[in-house]
C-alpha cells in the first residue's frame, strides 16, 4: 500500500470506504497538496484526514440523534431554547456545508440504520421510508421570540425510481423560523405508525380537515412540508459506521399545530440535525424561495441548505418534472409521476410570475415584524431584497445579504448526492401505485388545488433536457404558471441555460462558479428567466414574422419561371463588348444579331422612345447608338470607313506657287475573282495574276504605267487592292490615297458584298468612280443587269442619264482597255490633280513587311514633294533614313516624285500600313516628332489590345465553370503588316461562344526562335503566312514539340483555324434509330418476363436502348439486356425474324406492345451552332 511511507489518495478512499472526491475535499480543507486521486500523501497527512472525517461524521450523527430524542420528550418551548443555543454556534453551518455534506459513503449506511430505528415494523419493504425529525426554530434577533417547532413525517427518498412514496405523508404543519412574534405550540404527540402508507395519509388529511385554517396558512404549511419531503433523505440522522442497527416501531409525529399564526415560519432546523444523506439535503425554507445550496443565510440566521418549495405551491411529491429542464444539479428527474398539481393557486392575491424580482401581494406575517432590514412587500409580505441570488438565477435588485462563498467541489457534491443511491428501491412499483391511488383519493377537501385550469393555456416554448419523460405525465407542475397564463400574456421564452441532470459530467458542476456569481449552469429548481419583459417581447417578435410564408400564386410562379428562363438565356448569350457599324444604317434584325438579342427587344426599346419600327426597317447611326447604349454596348463607326477618308491635305499654302500637274493614282477595287488583277495585267501587259498564290491578290500592288493619249505620254499610277473580304483595311488604305476609283464588276456575277463595300469606301474618300464591267466575253454576261443593280446603289450610267462612267471591258481579250484608260484620264483631268515637286516629300505607307535580308521594308506612295535617298523621315511612330529605293520593276532609283510608288529601306522597325510619312531636314526634329507619336501609339495600342481581349468576365467565368469555354492560343507571323491585319480581322469574325481564340503575338516577319520559346511556354500554335523560318527555328520547334503551320492562301489558313476550334468542342450525341419490333407473346421466367417479338423493320441489337410503346405512349425506356433466338443468345436479330427480348428493369409486357430500338452516336459539332 505504501511507497516510502506514503499512501495514494485512492487507496485511502478505499480503506475508508469513501469516494476520492471526499478525500480530496478533506485534503483541501487541511491544506494538504494533492492533485488527483493518484497523488501520494504521507501517512501523517492520511491520519489527519481520517481524524477529520471521523470527527465530522460523529458530530453529525450525534446531533441528529439528540434532535430526534428531544423532539420526542421535550416541550416545544424548551426545544426552541435549545435550538437557539445550537444555532448560536456559528461553527456548525460551516462544518456542515464544507465537511459533512460531501461525504457520500458516510451518508449511506448510517442513514439506513437510523431509518430502521424509526420505521414501523409493519412495513416489510427494504429501507422503510418514514422517519420523524424535529426542526427547531432559530432566533434571528435578540428581541424576537424563540418558539415554534414542526414535526413532519417523511418517507425515505433513497429510491429515485419510486418518488411517489412521498405522497403517503401529507404535511401536518410547517412553518419557518421568523423574527415575527410567535405563540406556543401544543406538545408533540407520539403516535403509532399506520399499517400502510395510504391509511397514514388519510389520518394526516383528517387531522388537517379538523384543524383547517385559512388558505394562507395552508399554503405555507404545504410548501414547508414539500420542502422537507423533498429533502428528507439528506436529513436522516447519522451514526457511526460501527454502531448497531437500532430497530423501533413507533415513529415521531408532529403534534397538532396551531393554525392561528399562518405566517409564522419556525422550520429553522437544529444545525446538528441537518446531516445530509445519500439523496438530497433538507434545509429550512425561506418564505417564497430557497437558498442556494451550501450558502449561509444572512446574519443571525441558520445555515440554510437546499431550501424546499415556496409556500403556496402544492406538496410536490412525485410531481412531474419541470417542463423544459431537469431537476436540481445531481438530482435525477422524478419518475412515475404523482397527481397533476393543476390549479394550486399561489399565495393570496399574487400570481407567481417567473423571473420577477419579488412576489407582490404576499401578506406580512401577522403579529410580527419582518426580518431585520427587510422592507415589507407591497402586498404585506417581506420584500426579499436582502437575499443573495440563487446560482444561475437572475440577479435580484437590492440583494444585500452577505453570503459565504462555496467551493465548486462542495456545490457539486450537494447537488449530486442523490445520484449514488438511485438504484436502492424502498417501495415497490405495486406499493407505489397503491399509495398514489390512496393519496389521490384522500386529499383534504381544503387542499388548494385549482379545479378549473385554463384549457387554452399555452405551453411556454421550453425544451426538455431529458428525453426520459414518462407517458401520462403532464407538462406543468406549478399552479403559478397556469395562473400566470390565465392572467398575463402568453408566457415568454425563457433564457436558454444548461440545466444539469443526472448524466452531466461532474466537471461541469465543479466549474459552475461560487455563490454570489452569475453562472449559466443551473439546477432545474433554481432556473429563472433572465430577460426582462420588454426584452422577451422584442426577441419574440421576429420569430413570429417568419413563421408564415405566403403561398405562391400561379401568376407569381409563372412570372418567376419566366424571369429564370430569361436570366438563363441572358447568361448563355455573350453580348459583344462593342459593335462596329460598317455602313451608315442597319436594319432592326441586323442590329439585333450584332447585339445578340431578339428583334422584339429592339422593337420594344424603340417603342418606348416613341419610334415605331419593324424588323426590316433601317435605322440611322444616331438611333443605333441610342439603342446599343441602352443595352450597355458602345457603338463605333467602321474604322475602315474612317480610314478611307482623306484626313490630311497634302497641298499646303506654301506649295501654291510651285504646283504642277501630277499623275493620277487609280485604285482598282471590286469583289474577289471579278478580274481586277487581270485587268491591270492587260493594262501593264504583264502576267502578275498568274504568279499570285491561289490566283488571288493578297497585297496592294503599286504600279506606274505610261499611256499615250493625244500624242502625249501620260503616267498613271495603279494600286491593286485585294478583293477578299479579309482585306477590307487594305482596300480602305488604297481608297484613302487614290484620286480615281475603278470599280470592277463581273458581267456574269453582278454586284457582290465586296462590291458594295468598295462603293462605300469610294464615297467615304469622296473620289470619282469609274465602273469597269468585266468578263463581257463570257457566256451569260449581262452588262445591263449590272447597270440595273448599280443603279439601285445610286450609281447610274451616263447612257441611262446619270454621271457615272461605265465601260464594258474584257481583260482576257483586252477589249475596250484603251477606252477605259481614256475615261480615267478624263475624270482625273476634271479633278485637276497638282503637287509641288520641290518640297520635302510627304505621302502614305501603302504596305510594310520585314525582310530577313533587307530588314524593314515599306511601300511608299509619294503624294507631294520629292523623296530622295538619304532623307530622314518619320512614318507614324517609326523613324527611318532612306538607304535605298526601288521601283515596281526592281530597279534602283535615287529619287521619286509625286504619285510615284517606291519600296524604301532603312526604317528602325516595320512601320504601320496606312500611316502617313513626312521628311524632315534633320534627325533631331524627326526624333522629337517620333517620340511624341510613339507615346500616343503605345497608349492607343494598349487600349486596342485590352478592347480586343476584353471578354465579359461574368460570362467567361460562367462558361469556364460549366466547362463550355475552350481556348485556342495562336502566334501569327505574316509577310506584311496588311496580311497580319487581314488575318486578325478574319479571326474576329469567327464564332466565339464556346471556343475563344487568343492571339498572343502577331507581327510581320519570319518565324524566330523567340517565337518558338513563347509557343512552347504557352502551348500555342504558330501560324506563318507567306513567311519563312529563321535559322535554328525549325530545330527549336522540333525540340520543344511546337506545331508550326505555314500558309500561302488566307482561305486555307482560316479553314484550318476553324477546324481546330471545332475540334475543341465536345461532340453531340445523336439518337439513331435501329429498328422496330412487335410483342406477340409473353413468357414468365422466374421473377421476370420475356417478350416474344417479331422484327417489323430494321434490327434489334443486344445492349441497345429501347422504348416500349403501348397505345402510342411510352411506358418504359431503358436498355435491351437479353436477346435470344431459339434459346440461343444472339447479338442482333434482323427484319422478319422472331426473337425473345428481356429487360432487367421491366417485366410487364403485353401483347401488342411496340419496341423501338435506337442507339446514340457522336456527331462532330461546328462553330455555326
UniProtKB/Swiss-Prot annotation:
Region listing for Disordered, in residue ranges: 69-108, 139-568
Region (G3) location: 720-723
Location of the region described as G2 in the Swiss-Prot/TrEMBL record: 695-699
Cross-referenced Pfam families: EF-G_D2, GTP_EFTU, IF-2, IF2_N
A GO term for molecular function: GTP binding
Residue stretches making up the tr-type G domain: 661-838
Region (G4): 774-777
Primary location: cytoplasm
Family affiliation: Belongs to the TRAFAC class translation factor GTPase superfamily. Classic translation factor GTPase family. IF-2 subfamily.
Known function: One of the essential components for the initiation of protein synthesis. Protects formylmethionyl-tRNA from spontaneous hydrolysis and promotes its binding to the 30S ribosomal subunits. Also involved in the hydrolysis of GTP during the formation of the 70S ribosomal complex.
Protein name: Translation initiation factor IF-2
Lineage: Bacteria, Bacillati, Cyanobacteriota, Cyanophyceae, Synechococcales
Amino acid at each position: 500500500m505504501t511507497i516510502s511511507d506514503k499512501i495514494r489518495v485512492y487507496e485511502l478512499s478505499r480503506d475508508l470506504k469513501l469516494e476520492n472526491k471526499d478525500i480530496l475535499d478533506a485534503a483541501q480543507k487541511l491544506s494538504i497538496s494533492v492533485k488527483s486521486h493518484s497523488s501520494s500523501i504521507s501517512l501523517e497527512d492520511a491520519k489527519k484526514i481520517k481524524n477529520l472525517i471521523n470527527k465530522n461524521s460523529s458530530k453529525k450523527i450525534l446531533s441528529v440523534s439528540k434532535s430526534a430524542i428531544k423532539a420526542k420528550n421535550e416541550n416545544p418551548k424548551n426545544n426552541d431554547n435549545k435550538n437557539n443555543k445550537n444555532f448560536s454556534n456559528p461553527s456548525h453551518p460551516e462544518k456542515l456545508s464544507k465537511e459533512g455534506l460531501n461525504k457520500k459513503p458516510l451518508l449511506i449506511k448510517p442513514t439506513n440504520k437510523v431509518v430502521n430505528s424509526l420505521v414501523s415494523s409493519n412495513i416489510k419493504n427494504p429501507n422503510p421510508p418514514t422517519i420523524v425529525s424535529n426542526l427547531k426554530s432559530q432566533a434571528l434577533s435578540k428581541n424576537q421570540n424563540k418558539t415554534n417547532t414542526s414535526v413532519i413525517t417523511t418517507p425515505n427518498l433513497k429510491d429515485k425510481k419510486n418518488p411517489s412514496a412521498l405522497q403517503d405523508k401529507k404535511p401536518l404543519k410547517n412553518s419557518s423560523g421568523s423574527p415575527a412574534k410567535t405563540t406556543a405550540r401544543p406538545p408533540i404527540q407520539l403516535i403509532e405508525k399506520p399499517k400502510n402508507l395510504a391509511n397514514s395519509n388519510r389520518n394526516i388529511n383528517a387531522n388537517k380537515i379538523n384543524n383547517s385554517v385559512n388558505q394562507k396558512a395552508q399554503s405555507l404549511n404545504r410548501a414547508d412540508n414539500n420542502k422537507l419531503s423533498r429533502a428528507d433523505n439528506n436529513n436522516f440522522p447519522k451514526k457511526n459506521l460501527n454502531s448497531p442497527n437500532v430497530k423501533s416501531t413507533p415513529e415521531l409525529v408532529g403534534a397538532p399545530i396551531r393554525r392561528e399564526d399562518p405566517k409564522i415560519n419556525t422550520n429553522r432546523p437544529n444545525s446538528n440535525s441537518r446531516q445530509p444523506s445519500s439523496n438530497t439535503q433538507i434545509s429550512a425554507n425561506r418564505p417564497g424561495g430557497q437558498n442556494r445550496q451550501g450558502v449561509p443565510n444572512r446574519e443571525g440566521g441558520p445555515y440554510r441548505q437546499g431550501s424546499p418549495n415556496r409556500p403556496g405551491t402544492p406538496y410536490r411529491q412525485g410531481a412531474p418534472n419541470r417542463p423544459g429542464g431537469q431537476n436540481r444539479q445531481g438530482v435525477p428527474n422524478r419518475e412515475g409521476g404523482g397527481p397533476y398539481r393543476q390549479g394550486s393557486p399561489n399565495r393570496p392575491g399574487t400570481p407567481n410570475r417567473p423571473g420577477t424580482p419579488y412576489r407582490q401581494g404576499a401578506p406580512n406575517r401577522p403579529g410580527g415584524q419582518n426580518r431585520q432590514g427587510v422592507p415589507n412587500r407591497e402586498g404585506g409580505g417581506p420584500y426579499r431584497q436582502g437575499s443573495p441570488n440563487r446560482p444561475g438565477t437572475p440577479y435580484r435588485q437590492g440583494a444585500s445579504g452577505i453570503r459565504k462563498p462555496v467551493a465548486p467541489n462542495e456545490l457539486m457534491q450537494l447537488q449530486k448526492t442523490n445520484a449514488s443511491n438511485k438504484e436502492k428501491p424502498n417501495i415497490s412499483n405495486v406499493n407505489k401505485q397503491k399509495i398514489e391511488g390512496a393519496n389521490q383519493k384522500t386529499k383534504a377537501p381544503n387542499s388548494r388545488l385549482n379545479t378549473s385550469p385554463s384549457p387554452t393555456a399555452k405551453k411556454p416554448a421550453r425544451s426538455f433536457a431529458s428525453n426520459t419523460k414518462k407517458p401520462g405525465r403532464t407538462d406543468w407542475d406549478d399552479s403559478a404558471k397556469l395562473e400566470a397564463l390565465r392572467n398575463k400574456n402568453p408566457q415568454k421564452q425563457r433564457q436558454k441555460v444548461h440545466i444539469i441532470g443526472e448524466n452531466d459530467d461532474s466537471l461541469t458542476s465543479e466549474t459552475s462558479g461560487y455563490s454570489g456569481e452569475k453562472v449559466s449552469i443551473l439546477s432545474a429548481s433554481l432556473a429563472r428567466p433572465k430577460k426582462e419583459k420588454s426584452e422577451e417581447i422584442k426577441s419574440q417578435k421576429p420569430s413570429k414574422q417568419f413563421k408564415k410564408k405566403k403561398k405562391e400564386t400561379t401568376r407569381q410562379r409563372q412570372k418567376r419561371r419566366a424571369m429564370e428562363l430569361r436570366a438563363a438565356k441572358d447568361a448563355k448569350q455573350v453580348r459583344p463588348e462593342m459593335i462596329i457599324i460598317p455602313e451608315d444604317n442597319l436594319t432592326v434584325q441586323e442590329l439585333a444579331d450584332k447585339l445578340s438579342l431578339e428583334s422584339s427587344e429592339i422593337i420594344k426599346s424603340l417603342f418606348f422612345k416613341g419610334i415605331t419600327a419593324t424588323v426590316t426597317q433601317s435605322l440611322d447611326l444616331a438611333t443605333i447608338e441610342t439603342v446599343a447604349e441602352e443595352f450597355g454596348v458602345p457603338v463605333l463607326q467602321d474604322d475602315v470607313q474612317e480610314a478611307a477618308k482623306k484626313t490630311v491635305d497634302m497641298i499646303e499654302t506654301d506649295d501654291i506657287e510651285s504646283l504642277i500637274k501630277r499623275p493620277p493614282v487609280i485604285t482598282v477595287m471590286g469583289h474577289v475573282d471579278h478580274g481586277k488583277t487581270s485587268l491591270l495585267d492587260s493594262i501593264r501587259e504583264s502576267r502578275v495574276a498568274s504568279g499570285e498564290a491561289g490566283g488571288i491578290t493578297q497585297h496592294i500592288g503599286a504600279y506606274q504605267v505610261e499611256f499615250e493619249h493625244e500624242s502625249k505620254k501620260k503616267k498613271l499610277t495603279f494600286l491593286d487592292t485585294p478583293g477578299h473580304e479579309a482585306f477590307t483595311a487594305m482596300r480602305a488604305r488604297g481608297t484613302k490615297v487614290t484620286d480615281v476609283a475603278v470599280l470592277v464588276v463581273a458581267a456574269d456575277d453582278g454586284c457582290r458584298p465586296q462590291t458594295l463595300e468598295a462603293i462605300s469606301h469610294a464615297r467615304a474618300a469622296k473620289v470619282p468612280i469609274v465602273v469597269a464591267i468585266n468578263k463581257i466575253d463570257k457566256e451569260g454576261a449581262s452588262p445591263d443587269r449590272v447597270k440595273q443593280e448599280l443603279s439601285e446603289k445610286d450609281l447610274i450610267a451616263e447612257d441611262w442619264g446619270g454621271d457615272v462612267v461605265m465601260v464594258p471591258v474584257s481583260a482576257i481579250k483586252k477589249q475596250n482597255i484603251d477606252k477605259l484608260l481614256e475615261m480615267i484620264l478624263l475624270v482625273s483631268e476634271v479633278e485637276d490633280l497638282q503637287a509641288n515637286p520641290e518640297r520635302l516629300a510627304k505621302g502614305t505607307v501603302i504596305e510594310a513587311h520585314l525582310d530577313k535580308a533587307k530588314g524593314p521594308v515599306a511601300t511608299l506612295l509619294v503624294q507631294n514633294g520629292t523623296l530622295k535617298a538619304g532623307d530622314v523621315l518619320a512614318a507614324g511612330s517609326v523613324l527611318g533614313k532612306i538607304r535605298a529605293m526601288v521601283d515596281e520593276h526592281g530597279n534602283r532609283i535615287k529619287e521619286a516624285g509625286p504619285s510615284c510608288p517606291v519600296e524604301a529601306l532603312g526604317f528602325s522597325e516595320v512601320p504601320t500600313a496606312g500611316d502617313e510619312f513626312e521628311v524632315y531636314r534633320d534627325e533631331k526634329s524627326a526624333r522629337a516628332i517620333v517620340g511624341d507619336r510613339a507615346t500616343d501609339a503605345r497608349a492607343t495600342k494598349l487600349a486596342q489590345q485590352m478592347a480586343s481581349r476584353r471578354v465579359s468576365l461574368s460570362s467567361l467565368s460562367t462558361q469556364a465553370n460549366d466547362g463550355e469555354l475552350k481556348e485556342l492560343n495562336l502566334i501569327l507571323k505574316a509577310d506584311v503588316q496588311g496580311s497580319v491585319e487581314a488575318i486578325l480581322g478574319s479571326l474576329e469574325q469567327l464564332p466565339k461562344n464556346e471556343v475563344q481564340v487568343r492571339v498572343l503575338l502577331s507581327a510581320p516577319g519570319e518565324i524566330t526562335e523567340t517565337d518558338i520559346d513563347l509557343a512552347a511556354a504557352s502551348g500555342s500554335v504558330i501560324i506563318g503566312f507567306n513567311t519563312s523560318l529563321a535559322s535554328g527555328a525549325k530545330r527549336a520547334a522540333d525540340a520543344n514539340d511546337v506545331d508550326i503551320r505555314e500558309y500561302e492562301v488566307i482561305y486555307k489558313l482560316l479553314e484550318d483555324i476553324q477546324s481546330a476550334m471545332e475540334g475543341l468542342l465536345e461532340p453531340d450525341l445523336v439518337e439513331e434509330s435501329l429498328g422496330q419490333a412487335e410483342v406477340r407473346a409473353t413468357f414468365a421466367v422466374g421473377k421476370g418476363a420475356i417478350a416474344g417479338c417479331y422484327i417489323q423493320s430494321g434490327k434489334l441489337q443486344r445492349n441497345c436502348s429501347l422504348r416500349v410503346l403501348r397505345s402510342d405512349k411510352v411506358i418504359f425506356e431503358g436498355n435491351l439486356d437479353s436477346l435470344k433466338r431459339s434459346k440461343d443468345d444472339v447479338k442482333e436479330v434482323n427484319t422478319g425474324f422472331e426473337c425473345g427480348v428481356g429487360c432487367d428493369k421491366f417485366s410487364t409486357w403485353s401483347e401488342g406492345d411496340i419496341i423501338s430500338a435506337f442507339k446514340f452516336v457522336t456527331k462532330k459539332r461546328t462553330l455555326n451552332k
